[in-house]
Amino acid sequence: MEIVNCIGKKGDTNFAILYPSLRSNKSLVIELIKKIRKNHKTLVFSNSHLSAELIAFNASKQGIKIGIHRAGLLPKNRKMVENSFKNGMIGVLSSTPTLELGIDIGDVDAVISNLVPVNRLLQRLGRAARKGQEGYAFLTLGNDPISQYYKNHPADYFVDEEIPYIDPFNPIIMENQILAMCFDRPISKLESKEYLETLSKLQRKDLVIFNNGKYTPTNSEKQNVLKNYSIRGIGNDVDILFNGKIVGNRNLPHALEELHDDAIYFLSGRRYKVKKLILDEKTERNFADIDTIPINYPYYTKPIREEYPQVIEIFEEKEIFGIKLKYCSLNIYKKVLGYSNIEIGKEINQGKKVFFNDPITYTYATKGFIFRVPSPKEILKMASEKEKIEASGYHATEHVLIEGSSMLTGGASQDIGGISLGDTGMIVIHDGSIGGNGASKSLFDKFELAITRAHSILIECSCENDDGCPRCTYSYRCGNNNEYLHKNAAIEVLTRIINRERTTILEFNNFQQTLI
């Protein structure tokens, strides 16, 4: 064996961090693409499906030849986009993290990235200038709480490292992995002790049998269960149909929010309208039928939803400042009540609301933690609508805790949901995946720093609106149309936490309105 040491060919890369004080993040990105694309192949990274699709959609409207690469598209379509970019047929590619590593897309001259932890940013920027040419790299901040924080504390960005999070005990993953183990080699009674609960579930589903002291698959046809299992997501998929053909898919529970009836869905830079969402619990055959809409249709949609939590089992407890936190397993009862129409090109998080006659309901098991925050007593002394102001303060607190801690938890805010339980002060922060993904545990472990950072974001934001603004209290994931928010009440809540005001966790079953 011969070990070869050498230095790879890598050109100098010019790097800039940009903060859009007078425009939206998407407008800034489009302007960068227009300036760079003529002589430089450009890769644009977004952190969500919708952001990547909106970049491609808006760029196409301005005459830019751009492809899109993300999960949920058919593999053959992703491969076609990769080859088109590699061969120079398109000069700009809008992508989610699917292109961060491991896929050959040829030479890249410029990289534009939304906000991610610094070690992931370096991975993205490493895509540029690999053939020795001069490269260009841009980190574009946005109109959101964590971007506002880094604008005021830029040095913190370079010390906030990504800590990978995972939940190895996710029951969905365990069932599929242990079933695969049985196909590989029967599991003996002796080695099955730590898997007994999962093996019992597989037995009840008639996937394995216990015979002659070993667990074996019931028959070879059960391998079809594994063929339908994807490491890209957890839980069942919803197939997306156009003219009777599958053109993509989306995981539950996220599919409920993006593929409900009349939702506007972005696919490969184009917009479609969902004619009907079908969820068949018996056959697990789930699909959404989509159709084209006029090019000049002015809106896209965001869901209006409610969620109700149920605590199943407490795993861990601790106290931060005067707040008790309990990490636990949960059932989340989700309702999609309707949607908001958001005007294309407008950087707003509120829109005209449409409600369904029959809300879509779905229940899933996950993990998260619960806690109770103190009441904003001083604000309430002057308030005429005390219950509304109090609930709005707790809702804003929940938003900024999740959005503002994103880089502390390795960007986990995208995989986290939050529920504020009316005017009780009870807040639930949970994993957004069926069975759990470890994201909320990451925030649970760094909760003290999350509190102080959330407090800084609110007091440093110059807006004077009662409900705050996109840079402090708003969340693009809000299920309540970014309504019922109160910035000053949230500041008082967080100040009281930092001053170690103690609270007691309440038992909860049925509260009035929840805010998410």
Give the role of each language-model region.
Residues 127-130, 464-474:
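Conserved phosphate/anionic-ligand binding catalytic regions in large, soluble enzymes, centered on
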Residues 497-516:
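Acidic, low-complexity intrinsically disordered tails
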Residues 31-39, 476, 496, 515:
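ASCE P-loop NTPase motor cores of helicases and related translocases
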